[in-house]
A protein has these predicted regions:
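N-terminal flexible segment immediately upstream of the FAD-binding catalytic core
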Residues: 1-35, 39-44, 51-82, 229, ...
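A short linear hydrophobic-aromatic micro-motif
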Residues: 45, 107, 272-275, 393-399, ...
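Helical (often loop-to-helix) elements that flank the catalytic cores of nucleotide-handling enzymes
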Residues: 416-436, 460-471
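Helix N-cap motif at beta-to-alpha junctions
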Residues: 24, 255-259, 310-317, 375-377, ...
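N-terminal glycine-rich flavin-associated loop
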Residues: 9-46, 64, 68-110, 122-174, ...
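C-terminal substrate-binding/cap subdomain adjacent to the FAD-binding core in PCMH-type
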Residues: 121, 129, 139-347, 458, ...
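Intrinsic disorder at enzyme termini
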Residues: 462-507
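Flexible helix-coil linker/hinge segments at domain or subdomain boundaries
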Residues: 325-337, 431-447, 477-480
Length: 507
């Protein structure tokens, strides 16, 4: 059981039992069992787990863990239609390895160990999402086992089809009927969600259930970021793309975040595949351990690296590289064509991984990864974080994607120390407050899980909170689907399960 008690978060929860199904029938059996005993007033919490890559404790639970590790088959590849059908436990690495034979790929830049079901359930925003779209834009259809064991396939219904679906005398029919009434009654709330600050807290994808033309209704979007609280994804039909061309890179350095922000704002208009910024203190720490950036190393004394990647056709790339160099005329800019090995650019991300696993640090836990911050807010935030650094007496270099506005900071805490665990929780609360004060969202980059669920409530209005609670009840009337995640997260629960030893080999 210990192998299923941790993920990449700061908590550790030992389950009562672990089930490892091989197919959808197995999951239906397990869900019927859990639902039957829940109706007899014995709730066995059910948590689905892919490869255990969650950073927020979403795949941990005290009840039954359903691991999809054996549901890892690629069922069908339609090269002509560019569609692929996979089981939810297929990893991104395996999928793209198979698709490469067809010169296709799923252009989502995430941890290769992530499962497709996990990517949908946690709904991360990757650095390429601005150009290609997040995982949401590549999912055509889902097969889901509901809380009572019923199996459904998501369908985009017309109004006539929706009326027929509502008449079904089973949980699926009650879901469509209840959700349609809920969406209609909360139209103004949903409109505010769609136009509000970018947040993954709750079930914000409810804003995509009823299309703007009011002619179609589809529950598929609700499972993005739901973290197994509404049902268990078993199969996915994905839309895939041709493998993109190898990118060309431009590196610029700046002494301040303000200067870097001015540059990135202009470069973003050229629609790069990726546009990332790194505090160079990250690379100075890596350099102490013999990890270097090759010919990029002399630039390390500047405050911030900005790395831009273009992967359009050759002529468009050449033009955009020239334009980017012109924008950065007052900065130090280097391209992969300028006697710099392409591997040196790839090494930037490798060195970030070295920083995250610094052997001289007790641990840099993923407490505040993937928060959302606008460009203008980023400058204000970089100033405010200096006071946090002073209070903690440690550096907090920022890194992330300007293109998607998703950033990460990794504090250094010794979770084996009681006082340090207390400081970590205080830091979590204060940091989330600073993010909101600067116009950002603490849960902008992925769903909140258990850990971020503690501090995501201020991002929701009372009506939004009530709406999300009602959605949960419609799908999970007996309340046993990952109940301590998202809206069910409590401070007492997280503190009780805080790890007392570090995670080895975790980024």
């Amino acid at each position: 059981l210990h192998a299923y008690s941790r993920d990449k978060s700061v908590i550790e929860v030992t389950p009562r039992l672990v089930a490892i199904p091989y197919d959808t029938d197995d999951i239906q059996f397990l869900m019927r069992f859990a639902n039957d005993i829940a109706e007899k007033d014995f709730k066995l919490p059910v948590t689905v787990r892919g490869s255990g890559q969650s950073k927020t404790g979403a795949c941990l639970g005290e009840g039954m863990i359903i691991s999809t590790e054996k549901m890892n088959h690629i069922e069908e590849v339609d090269e002509t239609s560019r569609l692929v059908r996979v089981q939810a436990g297929v990893t991104l690495e395996k999928l793209n390895a198979v698709l490469a034979a067809y010169h296709l790929c799923l252009p989502v830049k995430a941890n290769e160990k992530e499962t497709i079901g996990g990517l949908i359930s946690t709904f991360p925003t990757d650095p390429y999402a601005k150009k290609y779209g997040s995982i949401f834009y590549f999912v055509d259809r889902l097969e889901v086992v509901l809380s009572n064991g019923d199996l459904i396939q998501t369908v985009s219904y017309t109004q006539h089809g929706l009326k027929n679906a509502e008449k079904a005398d089973k949980l699926e029919g009650r879901i469509y009927k209840g959700l349609n009434e809920l969406v209609t009654a909360n139209a103004d709330v949903i409109e505010n969600i769609a136009g509000g600050v970018h947040s993954r807290a709750g079930y914000p994808m409810v804003s995509h259930v009823k299309k703007k033309d009011q002619r179609t209704f589809d529950i598929l979007p609700l499972f993005f970021g739901a973290e197994g609280t509404l049902g268990i994804i078993t199969e996915v039909i994905l839309r895939v793309e041709p493998i993109p061309r190898h990118g060309k890179h431009v590196l610029a350095t700046f002494p301040t975040m303000e200067k870097a922000n001015e540059y990135m704002k202009k470069v973003a208009k050229l629609e790069p595949a990726a546009l990332e910024v790194f505090d160079t203190r990250i690379f100075k720490i890596a350099a102490k351990h013999g990890k270097h950036l090759g010919l990029l190393e002399p630039l390390i004394d500047n405050g911030y690296y900005v790395l831009t990647e273009f992967n359009d056709n050759r002529f468009a790339v050449a033009k955009k590289v020239r334009q980017t160099l012109g924008i950065g005329a007052n900065a130090i800019s280097i391209t992969a064509e300028n006697n710099i090995n392409v591997d040196d650019f790839k090494e930037v991300h490798t060195l970030v991984d070295c920083y995250l696993n610094d052997e001289n640090s007790m641990e840099r836990p993923s407490l505040v990864d993937d928060f959302y911050m606008t460009g203008d807010g980023l400058v204000k935030f970089s100033d405010k974080i200096k006071s946090i650094e002073k209070a903690l007496n440690q550096d907090l270099p920022i890194f992330g994607s300007y293109a998607t506005s998703i950033y990460t900071v990794r504090p250094d805490f010794d979770l084996s120390n009681i006082a340090e665990r207390k400081r970590a929780m205080q830091f979590l609360r204060y940091f989330s407050k600073v993010v909101r004060e600067c116009g950002g969202s603490f849960t902008g980059g992925r769903s909140e899980g258990r850990v971020k669920g503690l501090v995501s409530t201020p991002e929701l209005t009372n009506r939004e909170h009530a709406l999300y609670g009602d959605i949960k009840k419609i799908f999970d009337p007996n309340g046993f689907m990952n109940p301590e995640t998202k809206l069910g997260a409590t401070f007492a629960d997280v503190v009780r399960h805080l790890r007392t030893s570090e995670n080895q080999g975790v980024k």
